Every structure is written in C-alpha cells, then in structure tokens.
Amino acid sequence: LGDVYKRQMLMCLLHDVVEIDAGDTYAYDEKGKETQKAREEAAKERIYGLLPEDQKECFQQLFEEFEARETAESKFAHAMDNLQPLLLNDSNNGGDWKAHRVTAEQVYGRQSQTKDGSEVLFEWTDAVIQKNIAAGNIQKES
C-alpha cells in the first residue's frame, strides 16, 4: 500500500481506538453526542499518554487531522469511517435503523460529508440508502 493509504488507515484506526475507550456514541444519539467530545478527548490523552513522546505526537496529529476533515486524506478516511455502519445496517435489513426509527434525513445528514471524500462512494452510498428507504428499513420522514 502507498503512504497515503497507510495514513488514511492509521487515521481510522487511531480514531476507533479512542472511540472504543471513550465508549462509542451511536450515530443518531443526540444526547450521547453532548458528552462525546469530552469523553474522546480524555480517552485520547489517556491512551496516547502511554506512548513515547514521538509516537504520541504523531498519533495525536493524525487523530486531529482526522477530526478536522480539512485534508483530502482525512475526508476520505471519514467517508470510509461512515461506510462501515451503513454496510452493517444494509446487511442486517436495517436492524439498527428500524430499532431507532432513523429517518432518511438523519442518514443523509450523517453521509453528507461522504461526497467530500469520494463522489463515487457517495453515489454508491446514495443507492444503498434509497434501497433501504424503499424496503422500509429507513423512515422517509420523521
């Protein structure tokens, strides 16, 4: 793999490690999102604080780049990060979407930044969303 792909994979992994430690927040849990940033910041400091200083700085920089979504690499990494739960819901007939009464507006809101990372991936994502709306797995309206 090229350096760009390695960097993107590291961004996703480093972000996920922090989410695991902080307690992942369900994508459509507005109440959980209120404390998400603080929990993730504390987890990041705790986990990366265990590392030698040079690794800590490198990993924190990659984490911050991922969070900022300003570089092409971080935008694509975010698109990939958003893809996993979409694929999971698609493969289980919208199990979580149905259980939480998720609307098309919510799913499109979450996936809106996918286009910034990859137009092709967004087109595919849109087709998956439309298929799940038609199947009744995602509510058309709230």
Q: Model-found features: residue ranges?
A:
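Short, function-defining helix-loop hinge/capping sites that tune catalysis or transport
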Residues: 23-27, 87-90
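Active-site alpha-helical segments that house and flank conserved acidic catalytic motifs
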Residues: 7-25
